[in-house]
Amino acid sequence: RGEEKLVFSLGKYGILWKHDRVSGEFKGYKETVFQNAFTDIDSVTGRVTYREDIQNAKLNEWTSACPSSAGGKDWHSMTYHEPSGLMIAPLSQTCLENAAREVALVQGGGGLAASRKFFEMPGTDGNLGKIGAYDVDTMEEVWSHQQRASFHTGTMSTGGDLVFVGDLDRRFKALNARTGEVLWETRLGTSVQGHPVSFAIDGKQYIAVTSAVGGTSPRTVPDVIATEITYPRWGNALYVFSLPEE
């Protein structure tokens, strides 16, 4: 950005990290959702101090942490909206009680080897889904859009100041990339998942997105927290949208 060459990352702890992408030098961070897994983050070096009770937990000993194993931010990509200098990310606001348990080592097996109890993140008023926009210069939150249903796609921004995203409640939305205002939405056949894409044919722009069942960690959490949100267990499809001809 400008003369600086930067790289940003955001993972399950919900912390947006900023580094020099040439030297790796730490430049700053922002907590995008409530987290209590780290007791301290050094503002100069970025070094984190992890909670000792989590590090030293014994088998069948319960600990509580935010965010849950769904994130923070899961695998869904965030988008950089260059005209406004905003990094816009899909976020998940849930927490977790967790206890390690002994499991048999079986070839081809796998799993979390833990007992889990999900709960709503404090201070969110029950909103599991959040879109957060962050100024890449100051690392401050400029706007957020929060809702009960969790988001299950990456965010995609356009040169026309739009950002597209989809959620578990089957809604595909276009927001104002500068303010977060919802400008348009439609409801698809089942939960919206994957990555919205934009493409053009003969000068006409199209927006495409997939609906699907399965997929991401945040999908399973509302099954025990937001049981009122339901969606068909079928309906995998590709949807393509465009503006009508004038």
Give names to the regions the model predicted.
Residues 1-246:
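Beta-sheet-rich non-transmembrane sensory/scaffold domains
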